[in-house]
């Protein structure tokens, strides 16, 4: 009987695992395709605005049918919180992230996203939600070591571009034709913008943790965030251009990318991530982040014929190693907490 129950538990984990891995594969392809659309010259915040608007359109019926009976009363404070959520996790984040993507590559962007757990951990220390004394434990030291490895990989990826390791003939059209100093400056600037975007996303995770307690309906919450973010992205697009004709996109490829990014990259990925995290936990969600990096690299290299650089490969590997070291420490910390809780309960039972 026990073996049958364990078998059922293992089988029940497969659907969310498959969904989350598929979601990460899709996110890698979204980054690669959006990068190609940005290369055409489209205002990156117009892409962001359309993406968030499409996400809102998709999530409205889902939120209505699944959460209409349990949605809490919408107060002014909750509206302000969702406005801030949209600013941190969508509009302002996309402003820097997509700008950085336009200067670098989908591979670099996905690699730097692997920094997010380490950055969130650093902010948790600064904001005192993570206790300094916990760093003296074995799990704490492993988490710090993982964070440092992550940062080292990101720095290597940023400051060492290296030679391209793809076939020079098949990828000739993707190589930049500007002078090398200008390319290096753009590369460094792009990495800086990406890191700023990921820092904003990390702050959003911390903020969202508080918001989800006050407003536990994830679909309608994401929908509200997307609506606010769509308007915010539209305002931020004025930074680059105030000409309304730029909102009229007649390139079929770019239109397809925007629809794909809105439906798959925003709405469906959010739904998949929410369901998967509820079923398997946030640690597993972080553990499969490198799947998007592999997906973006293969999509970039094999389909879009983007050149692959040695520095990107080495830095990406270092960042992924750091991520898994960090998650190893996080897992040990969780095990220690469970052991401590179990011993306390046993002591209380003995007293009774």
Swiss-Prot record:
The keyword Repeat applies. This is WAT1-related protein At1g11450. Residues 27-157, 192-335 form the EamA domain. SUPFAM superfamilies: Multidrug resistance efflux transporter EmrE. One of its GO terms (cellular component) is membrane. The chain crosses the membrane at residues 14-34, 46-66, 83-103, 107-127, 139-159, 187-207, 219-239, 253-273, 283-303, 308-328. PANTHER family: WAT1-RELATED PROTEIN (PTHR31218). It is found in: Membrane. Keywords: Membrane, Repeat, Transmembrane, Transmembrane helix. The keyword Transcription does not apply. InterPro entries: EamA_dom, WAT1-related. Signal peptide: none annotated. GO terms for molecular function: transmembrane transporter activity. Pfam families: EamA. It is a multi-pass membrane protein. Belongs to the drug/metabolite transporter (DMT) superfamily. Plant drug/metabolite exporter (P-DME) (TC 2.A.7.4) family.
């Amino acid at each position: 009987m026990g073996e049958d129950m364990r078998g059922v538990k293992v089988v029940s984990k497969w659907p969310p695992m498959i969904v989350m891995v598929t979601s990460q594969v899709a996110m890698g392809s979204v980054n690669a395709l959006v990068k190609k659309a940005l290369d055409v010259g489209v205002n990156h915040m117009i892409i962001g605005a359309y993406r968030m608007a499409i996400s809102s359109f998709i999530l409205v019926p889902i939120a209505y049918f699944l959460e209409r009976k349990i949605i809490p009363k919408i107060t002014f404070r909750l509206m302000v919180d969702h406005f801030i959520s949209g600013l941190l996790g969508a509009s302002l984040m996309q402003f820097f992230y997509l700008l950085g993507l336009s200067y670098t590559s989908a591979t670099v962007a996905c690699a730097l996203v692997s920094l997010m757990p380490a950055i969130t951990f650093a902010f948790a220390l600064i904001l005192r939600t993570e206790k300094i004394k916990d760093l003296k434990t074995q799990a704490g030291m492993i988490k710090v070591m993982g964070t440092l490895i992550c940062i080292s990989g990101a720095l290597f990826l940023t400051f060492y571009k290296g030679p391209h390791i793809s076939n020079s003939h098949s990828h000739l059209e993707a190589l930049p034709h500007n002078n090398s100093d200008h390319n290096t400056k753009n590369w460094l600037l792009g990495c800086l913008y990406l890191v700023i975007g990921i820092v904003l996303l990390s702050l959003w995770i911390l903020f969202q943790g508080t918001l989800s307690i006050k407003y536990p309906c994830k679909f309608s919450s994401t929908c509200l965030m997307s609506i606010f973010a769509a308007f915010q992205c539209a305002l931020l697009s004025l930074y680059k251009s105030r000409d309304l004709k730029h909102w009229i996109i007649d390139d079929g490829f770019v239109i397809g990318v925007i629809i794909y990014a809105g439906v798959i990259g925003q709405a469906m990925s959010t739904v998949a991530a929410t369901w998967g995290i509820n079923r398997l936990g946030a640690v597993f969600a972080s553990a499969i982040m490198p799947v998007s990096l592999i997906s973006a690299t293969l999509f970039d290299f094999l389909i879009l014929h983007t050149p692959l650089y040695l520095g990107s490969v080495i830095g990406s590997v270092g960042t992924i190693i750091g991520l898994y070291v960090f998650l190893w420490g996080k897992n040990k910390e969780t095990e220690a907490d469970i052991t401590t809780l179990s011993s306390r309960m046993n002591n209380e039972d003995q007293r009774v």
